[in-house]
Amino acid sequence: MRRPPRSLHAFIACACLLLASASVALAEDDSPPEPDGIWQGPLLGPVPATLAGGTVIDTATLADAIGPRGAVLIDVLPAQRRPAGQTTPWMPVPHRNIPHSVWMPGIGSGVITAEMTDYFANRLAELTGQDREKMIVFYCRPNCWASWNAAKRAIANGYRHVNWYPGGVEAWQAAGLPTEVSTPEGPGAQ
């Protein structure tokens, strides 16, 4: 049996690479552009593929950052609230996040109060030891603007090693990595 010419193998390999590149480009084209400032629209929906002034990271990079580099991890998923009008006892489902995270619900909202702004600035200074070069990672859930907004706020506060993990805790869990139960802190916890 005759083998196909090497040029055919090369052609097929090039075609596969072009298709893969086109798929990635199309996926990135589906992402909205970054807004000029903090996103003011609904917090759930398509998010940008970029973070001006910061870095978008994946699960492997995050797992590496947790180890010896000791990154500050901040989960900004909003806290569950008692349903309006509910008179019977209610207890929220325990919130799970990436180990060693600080859960600051509400920090990623489009508009935050002066109290929350001050809390965010002071807590970041405390968590980083006032080191504006310390690696900080913000996350929430997939397609959630809250972590993107919080990362932009940290950049605006002068932090220079700000990272955004857009896959959120779901991507972390999908990789088979552990989570832990967390308690919310700050003004957004009430």
Show the residue positions of the predicted features.
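Bacterial N-terminal signal peptides that target proteins for export
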Residues: 2-12
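Rhodanese-like catalytic fold shared by cysteine-dependent sulfurtransferases
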Residues: 2-3, 23-59, 65-68, 83-137, ...
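Structural scaffold elements adjacent to functional motifs in cytosolic proteins
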Residues: 73-75
